[in-house]
Amino acid sequence: MTTTTELQSLQRLLTWASPAFPVGSFAYSAGLETAIADRRVKDAATARDWIEGNLLAGAARNDAILMAEACRAYLDEQRLQQLTDLCLALTPALERHQELAATGEAFVLAARAWAAQTCGRLPSPCPYPVAFGALAGACGISPEAMLLAYLTAYVQAQISVAIRLVPVGQTQGLTILAALEPLVAEKAKELSRATLDDLGSVAYAADIAAMAHETLSTRIFRS
């Protein structure tokens, strides 16, 4: 494991979690586009509720747990394969399965500049949570810091979807981001210590929206 200072960790996390990092995350909505089309999400209040629900009991929570496990198991190829299989098996919709696999593979390819050896022993396809977690572990980044960056990026991405599809304006989006900061920090700390026994989801509306997305007559996003 590479010894990494806090500032180095911050610098790397800012890079890896940036929308500019070439994983294509801007092309996916994780079912939010369906919720907007169905008018479940129609303004800033409902957008915040949707995002918060996924942080508390949805796919974002499970992805964070799997990411923390991968961070701790970055040297264990068998464990990483098990986490990969579990991550993909827990995905309720085809498009979400494709999203995790595609963004994960893109992340592995882009991240070789930091940890080529770790990237070389990851499963293929490697879903995004496992790829991000393993790379963070290999670079000596703590699970809590990693999850703070990941969950912040998740919230930002969901807000960006809502802004592009009009229900939320830019100022409202920033208000949501600021309001969710305490919850993101709380979940990063809590889930950094979580194990596979803590996996679970009751965000049924989000799962159904992800499944229904492929049948939308007009789609901007790939999930």
From Swiss-Prot:
Q: What is its main location?
A: cytoplasm
Which InterPro entries does the annotation name? UreF (IPR002639), UreF_sf (IPR038277)
Q: State the function annotated in the UniProt record.
A: Required for maturation of urease via the functional incorporation of the urease nickel metallocenter.
Task: Specify the domain of life of the species encoding this protein.
Answer: Bacteria
This protein is called what?
A: Urease accessory protein UreF
Family designation: Belongs to the UreF family.
The annotated subunit structure for this chain is: UreD, UreF and UreG form a complex that acts as a GTP-hydrolysis-dependent molecular chaperone, activating the urease apoprotein by helping to assemble the nickel containing metallocenter of UreC. The UreE protein probably delivers the nickel.
Under Gene Ontology molecular function, one entry of this record is:
nickel cation binding
What keywords were assigned to this record?
Chaperone, Cytoplasm, Nickel insertion
Q: What is the lineage of its organism?
A: Bacteria, Pseudomonadati, Pseudomonadota, Alphaproteobacteria, Hyphomicrobiales
Question: What's a GO cellular component annotated to this UniProt protein?
Answer: cytoplasm
- HAMAP family given for it? UreF
Asked if the record carries the keyword Cytoplasm, the reply is: yes
